[in-house]
UniProtKB/Swiss-Prot annotation:
Allows the formation of correctly charged Gln-tRNA(Gln) through the transamidation of misacylated Glu-tRNA(Gln) in the mitochondria. The reaction takes place in the presence of glutamine and ATP through an activated gamma-phospho-Glu-tRNA(Gln). This is Glutamyl-tRNA(Gln) amidotransferase subunit A, mitochondrial. The gene is QRSL1. One of its GO terms (biological process) is glutaminyl-tRNAGln biosynthesis via transamidation. InterPro entries: Amidase (IPR000120), Amidase_dom (IPR023631), AS_sf (IPR036928), GatA (IPR004412). Subunit of the heterotrimeric GatCAB amidotransferase (AdT) complex, composed of A (QRSL1), B (GATB) and C (GATC) subunits. It comes from Macaca fascicularis. Residues 147-166 are annotated as: Disordered. Belongs to the amidase family. GatA subfamily. One of its GO terms (cellular component) is glutamyl-tRNA(Gln) amidotransferase complex. The active site is at 76 (charge relay system), 171 (charge relay system), 195 (acyl-ester intermediate). It catalyses: L-glutamyl-tRNA(Gln) + L-glutamine + ATP + H2O = L-glutaminyl-tRNA(Gln) + L-glutamate + ADP + phosphate + H(+).
Length: 528
């Protein structure tokens, strides 16, 4: 049961094949067995079991709340959860218990979902590896997969040491690891520059970033208000659509949410015709740093659409080379503004220094924030200085408009969906990842993803195939603003063609027997 999709488990619950309590207990048991992954900061065992008990009563009375009733989910620890600690993986908020739920959390609970816990991340979601939080780095479940370990045994240069584990990507790495290791069926991440799609690609998952304004940000502790979006991590596209159907819609507590009618639920056709589609391939994304394996799979994915009658067209996004610098200026500027609220006076960490308010304020922030967060605050304050404001922040805003217009022009040229890489390569070992600083790594890892956030578009990363090392590689689809359903429909068709294989966790074979029974093989269409 643990290896099935959300949709399959929902059907099993409705048919009485398993109860919510039994399912919850299985997931809690697996969370304990996979504690070494460090995916969870807080495990809400009592809360989840109580929710499972209530769900069980509803099923017995024939009053199921829908597809999410009784389904174990996890939430990134930068979403407020009433009565459950919310830390952002920072000393600044360690011990902070919010008095309210984020809108997306409340919507999941209103649909009967079971909250298994809060997942690990980079401090305040600032990073691309899930390595810079106070609770330690998250380990990629694929580090312990049969596929990866067998490939390592074949490599004469491999040391095959347990210390050579892989990063999950970030900053939603805990959520990605939680879903990948079968401890829940869906998880919330946040996506400011790729923080949901990046770990999805590294962990063999579907990572969906909705259009800006489609899903409420209320209760998501802000990083960059103009780009932050709640993200969804699942094992298949249909599951992401189910969760999106529960989350999408206007929220009076978030003025950026759209109030136009939205087609809900997001039902995806079982058979889609892609022959009339035009798939755009941005030529600026073909960069030297892109690994040969990702480049090859990207090309074969385009050929796959073409073989089905779709038109594949090379397009230009001419301001792409400026996007990562533009993103850095705007991101750090908004970070500096948002982090100003953590002053030790209202909530969160407070230093004991009583010399003056200014001294207490400075010491609190020095103790509460790590070097990465303090560095971004300093950069942002520099860009916002009176003498720098026009040359940096205002110019970056103008470039952002040009970047957004590039996408508009591409779609207006007849393109329906853009196809790009998600990451430069597969996941790398932790010891290799930390050789470079957070800022450098983030700039590299966000190269294909952050422009989508600046343009407010929907995007989804789909696992395509395993690399020669036995690790997941993902590709990204980008859609028009608020054409999320069309985007997911195309992604579902592609997912069916490539048939990405399930992870085989050697330590968890007994628990994941369903995975082995239903194991799929990598598609020959992209690997041959």
């Amino acid at each position: 049961m643990l290896g099935r999709t959300l949709q399959e488990v929902s059907a099993a619950l409705k048919q009485g094949q398993i109860t919510p309590t039994e399912l919850c207990q299985k997931c809690l048991s697996l969370i304990k067995k996979t504690k070494f992954l460090n995916a969870y900061i807080t495990v809400s065992e009592e809360v989840a079991l109580k929710q499972a008990e209530e769900s069980e009563k509803r099923y017995k009375n024939g009053q199921s709340l829908g597809d999410l009733d009784g389904i174990p989910v996890a939430v990134k620890d930068n979403f407020s959860t009433s009565g459950i600690e919310t830390t952002c993986a920072s000393n600044m908020l360690k011990g902070y218990i919010p008095p309210y739920n984020a809108t997306v959390v409340q919507k999941l609970l209103d649909q009967g979902a079971l909250l298994m816990g809060k997942t690990n991340l980079d401090e305040f979601a600032m990073g691309s590896g899930s390595t810079d939080g106070i609770f330690g780095p998250v380990k990629n479940p694929w580090s312990y997969s049969k596929q990866y370990r067998e490939k390592r045994k074949q490599n004469p240069h491999s040391k095959n040491e347990d210390s050579d584990w892989l990063i999950t990507g970030g900053s939603s790495g805990g959520s990605a690891a939680a879903v990948s290791a079968f401890t829940c069926y869906a998880a919330l991440g946040s996506d400011t520059g790729g923080s949901t799609r990046n770990p999805a690609a590294h962990c063999g998952l579907v990572g969906f970033k909705p259009s800006y304004g489609l899903v409420s940000r209320h209760g998501l502790i802000p990083l960059v208000n103009s780009m932050d979006v709640p993200g969804i991590l699942t094992r298949c596209v249909d599951d992401a659509a189910i969760v999106l159907g529960a989350l999408a819609g206007p929220d009076p507590k978030d003025s950026t949410t759209v109030h136009d009618p939205i087609n809900k639920p997001f039902m995806l056709p079982s058979l889609a015709d892609v022959s009339k589609l035009c798939i755009g391939i941005p030529k600026e994304y073909l960069i030297p740093e892109l690994s040969s394996e990702v480049r090859s799979l990207w090309s074969k994915a385009a050929d796959l659409f073409e073989s089905e009658g779709a038109k594949v067209l090379e397009v230009s996004l001419p301001h792409t080379s400026y996007s990562i610098v533009c993103y850095h200026v705007l991101c750090t500027s908004e970070v500096a503004s948002n982090m100003a609220r953590f002053d030790g006076l209202q909530y969160g960490h407070r230093c004991d220094i009583n010399v003056s308010t200014e001294a207490m304020y400075a010491a609190t922030r020095r103790e509460g924030f790590n070097d990465v967060v303090r560095g971004r605050i300093l950069s942002g304050n520099f860009f916002l200085l009176k003498e720098n404001y026009e040359n940096y922040f205002v110019k970056a805003q103008k470039v952002r408009r040009l970047i957004a217009n590039d996408f508009v022009n591409a779609f207006n040229s007849g393109v329906d969906v853009l196809l790009t890489p998600t990451t430069l390569s597969e996941a790398v070992p932790y010891l290799e990842f930390i050789k470079e600083d957070n800022r450098t790594r983030s700039a590299q890892d966000d190269i294909f993803t952050q422009a989508v956030n600046m343009a407010g578009l929907p995007a989804v990363s789909i696992p395509v195939a395993l690399s020669n090392q036995g690790l997941p590689i993902g590709l990204q689809f980008i859609g028009r603003a608020f054409c999320d359903q069309q985007l997911l429909t195309v992604a579902k068709w592609f997912e069916k063609q490539v048939q990405f294989p399930f992870i085989q966790l050697q330590e968890l074979m007994d628990d994941c027997s369903a995975v082995l029974e239903n194991e799929k093989s990598a598609s020959v269409s992209l690997k041959q």
